[in-house]
Regions:
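Short, Lys/Arg-rich, polar N-terminal cytosolic tail immediately upstream
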Residues: 1-13
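Helix-loop boundary and gating motifs at the non-cytosolic
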Residues: 12-58
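Short hydrophobic/alpha-helical segments at membrane-entry points of transmembrane helices
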Residues: 20-21, 104-110
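Transmembrane alpha-helix boundary/hinge residues in polytopic small-molecule transporters
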Residues: 34-38, 69, 107, 119-124
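Helix-to-coil boundary motifs at intracellular loop junctions of multi-pass secondary transporters
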Residues: 45-46, 76, 127-132
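Short hydrophobic/small-residue motifs within alpha-helical transmembrane segments
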Residues: 60-62
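Conserved MFS/SLC helix-loop-helix module at the cytosolic interface between two early adjacent transmembrane helices
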Residues: 65-104
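Cytoplasmic helix-loop-helix junction between adjacent transmembrane helices
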Residues: 109-135
Length: 135
């Protein structure tokens, strides 16, 4: 669908995958950003205070400090493998967050999403840079 806006300077592989990559990136971003608008509802569901849910989200956000180490590991993987690990991890984290019976598993789920989103984003960016010439 999006490939019709790309001219002939793009490789057929890029044109074939641009819609899938765009939809996947949109979905992973939605999984990553689903919590902030619903903090009060999530806190009420767990019967905890807003400050307690804030601690859970702080832990998730602090996991971003692992990004340099995650990036080094992702660089050793193939682009597709990094994207696959990221997608499986984000899906697992979202599922765990959705069905978690307590705040501890919820925190683990959103932290998984936060850490493994780096795998997908770096793998996808690397794949795009491999197939789109720099001008």
């Amino acid at each position: 669908m999006l490939d019709r806006w790309l001219d002939d300077s793009f490789s057929p592989l890029v044109k074939k995958n641009v819609t899938l990559l765009t939809a996947t990136r949109l979905t992973t971003n939605a999984c990553y950003r689903f919590t902030p608008p619903f903090i009060a509802i999530i806190a009420k569901g767990f019967d905890i205070s807003l400050s307690e849910i804030g601690v859970a989200l702080t832990i998730s956000e602090l996991s971003g400090l692992l990004s340099p180490f995650v990036g080094r590991f992702v660089d050793q993987l193939s682009r597709r493998r990094a994207m696959l690990i990221g997608l499986v991890g984000i899906s697992s984290g979202a599922l765990l967050s959705a069905v978690s019976p307590n705040i501890f598993l919820f925190t683990l789920g959103v932290t998984l999403i936060s850490v493994l989103k780096n795998f997908f984003d770096l793998g996808m960016s690397g794949w795009i840079s491999d197939h789109v010439p720099y001008e």
